[in-house]
Amino acid sequence: MIMAGGTGGHVFPGLAVARAMQAEGWRVIWLGTRNGMEATLVPQHGFTIELINFSGLRGKKPVSYLLLPWRLAKACWQSFCILRRQRPQIVLGMGGYPALPGGIMAVLSGKPLLIHEQNRIAGLTNKILAKIASRILLAFPGTITDQAGKIQVTGNPVRTEIAQLPSPEVRYAKRAGKLNILVVGGSLGAQALNTVLPQALSMIPGNQRPFVTHQSGKVHLAALQQAYAEHGVTGNLVAFIEDMAVYYQNCDLVVCRAGALTIAELAAAGVASILVPYPYAVDDHQTANARFLSEHHAAVLWPQSELTANSLAQWLMTCTRTQLQTMAINARMLAMPEAAQSVVTVCQQLIETGP
């Protein structure tokens, strides 16, 4: 049984593991919530999902905290009933609030519990479950340190087509002329990037100006098109990118946020990046994620508060493809492309040996 929900940062890694399990003949059941994206996304990928009633607390009104004991007890009972009905051999928590009651009841039911933490700073659910889990799987070394005997670093599961891209040495060596930049703000876009990029491009002489593909998010596409037009620059402006592997393969540089999956994909693809962490992320975990690449000279960490059109334009005009290739090679050296299979292997070992 896989438990994950709330955001794509938990659900998509869970789906990657689910597919790896399914490929080995496993029956996979998902535990999620009715209001999370997993309720529709998981069935679309062909997996059975069981739903409980539970939600996160961060940012909620004080009354939500008063109701927490009742809501948690109810969710635990629902999880217990599902566990008794489905009888999984092992339970894997991938983070997000549905994993909390499910993880608690898995342990109380005598089921082996593994948790996987995608970010460099652990989320609240995994901080709690780490104390009772049989195994703790991490995307980044050092995220959890007080359970040393139970920890294994597996990396974050990424899509196979990204992990199988040619090496940076092969890709970058064939290129000449203007840089090719990919700007990604996530499925909802990043307004700070949408504002700064067209203005920065307008400050670069036409004969030096990079080719740009800019994913804006559906809501912001019209405004982005207007901004590019007002600044007299052009680009391939899209609301959403389905096949990221193709764009990673063809670009010299990615400008993006620093979600855990983005970091894993940049490393797996082997591509240089400017990382602009979302400044309001819980516990500022995106900055911690970004440092994993920047500390290894595989990316530039650029706080949003310091990102201006002028500074970005100056950086792009002085940057060379050779420098970007070096960053891309460094990124690829940090990749863990077998992460999904590693998670499955640990699950299999735990089934065979017990908690």
Curated annotation (Swiss-Prot):
<keyword id="KW-0132">Cell division</keyword>
<dbReference type="GO" id="GO:0051301">
    <property type="term" value="P:cell division"/>
</dbReference>
<dbReference type="GO" id="GO:0008360">
    <property type="term" value="P:regulation of cell shape"/>
</dbReference>
<dbReference type="GO" id="GO:0009252">
    <property type="term" value="P:peptidoglycan biosynthetic process"/>
</dbReference>
<dbReference type="GO" id="GO:0030259">
    <property type="term" value="P:lipid glycosylation"/>
</dbReference>
<comment type="pathway">
    <text>Cell wall biogenesis; peptidoglycan biosynthesis.</text>
</comment>
<keyword id="KW-0808">Transferase</keyword>
<dbReference type="GO" id="GO:0005886">
    <property type="term" value="C:plasma membrane"/>
</dbReference>
<dbReference type="Pfam" id="PF03033">
    <property type="entry name" value="Glyco_transf_28"/>
</dbReference>
<dbReference type="GO" id="GO:0071555">
    <property type="term" value="P:cell wall organization"/>
</dbReference>
<keyword id="KW-0328">Glycosyltransferase</keyword>
<dbReference type="GO" id="GO:0050511">
    <property type="term" value="F:undecaprenyldiphospho-muramoylpentapeptide beta-N-acetylglucosaminyltransferase activity"/>
</dbReference>
<keyword id="KW-0961">Cell wall biogenesis/degradation</keyword>
<feature type="binding site">
    <location>
        <position position="241"/>
    </location>
    <ligand>
        <name>UDP-N-acetyl-alpha-D-glucosamine</name>
    </ligand>
</feature>
<dbReference type="GO" id="GO:0005975">
    <property type="term" value="P:carbohydrate metabolic process"/>
</dbReference>
<dbReference type="InterPro" id="IPR006009">
    <property type="entry name" value="GlcNAc_MurG"/>
</dbReference>
<keyword id="KW-1003">Cell membrane</keyword>
<comment type="function">
    <text>Cell wall formation. Catalyzes the transfer of a GlcNAc subunit on undecaprenyl-pyrophosphoryl-MurNAc-pentapeptide (lipid intermediate I) to form undecaprenyl-pyrophosphoryl-MurNAc-(pentapeptide)GlcNAc (lipid intermediate II).</text>
</comment>
<keyword id="KW-0997">Cell inner membrane</keyword>
<feature type="binding site">
    <location>
        <begin position="7"/>
        <end position="9"/>
    </location>
    <ligand>
        <name>UDP-N-acetyl-alpha-D-glucosamine</name>
    </ligand>
</feature>
<keyword id="KW-0472">Membrane</keyword>
<dbReference type="InterPro" id="IPR007235">
    <property type="entry name" value="Glyco_trans_28_C"/>
</dbReference>
<dbReference type="InterPro" id="IPR004276">
    <property type="entry name" value="GlycoTrans_28_N"/>
</dbReference>
<comment type="similarity">
    <text>Belongs to the glycosyltransferase 28 family. MurG subfamily.</text>
</comment>
<protein>
    <recommendedName>
        <fullName>UDP-N-acetylglucosamine--N-acetylmuramyl-(pentapeptide) pyrophosphoryl-undecaprenol N-acetylglucosamine transferase</fullName>
        <ecNumber>2.4.1.227</ecNumber>
    </recommendedName>
</protein>
<keyword id="KW-0131">Cell cycle</keyword>
<keyword id="KW-0133">Cell shape</keyword>
<feature type="binding site">
    <location>
        <position position="119"/>
    </location>
    <ligand>
        <name>UDP-N-acetyl-alpha-D-glucosamine</name>
    </ligand>
</feature>
<feature type="binding site">
    <location>
        <position position="159"/>
    </location>
    <ligand>
        <name>UDP-N-acetyl-alpha-D-glucosamine</name>
    </ligand>
</feature>
<keyword id="KW-0573">Peptidoglycan synthesis</keyword>
<dbReference type="Pfam" id="PF04101">
    <property type="entry name" value="Glyco_tran_28_C"/>
</dbReference>
<feature type="binding site">
    <location>
        <position position="286"/>
    </location>
    <ligand>
        <name>UDP-N-acetyl-alpha-D-glucosamine</name>
    </ligand>
</feature>
<feature type="binding site">
    <location>
        <position position="187"/>
    </location>
    <ligand>
        <name>UDP-N-acetyl-alpha-D-glucosamine</name>
    </ligand>
</feature>
<dbReference type="GO" id="GO:0051991">
    <property type="term" value="F:UDP-N-acetyl-D-glucosamine:N-acetylmuramoyl-L-alanyl-D-glutamyl-meso-2,6-diaminopimelyl-D-alanyl-D-alanine-diphosphoundecaprenol 4-beta-N-acetylglucosaminlytransferase activity"/>
</dbReference>
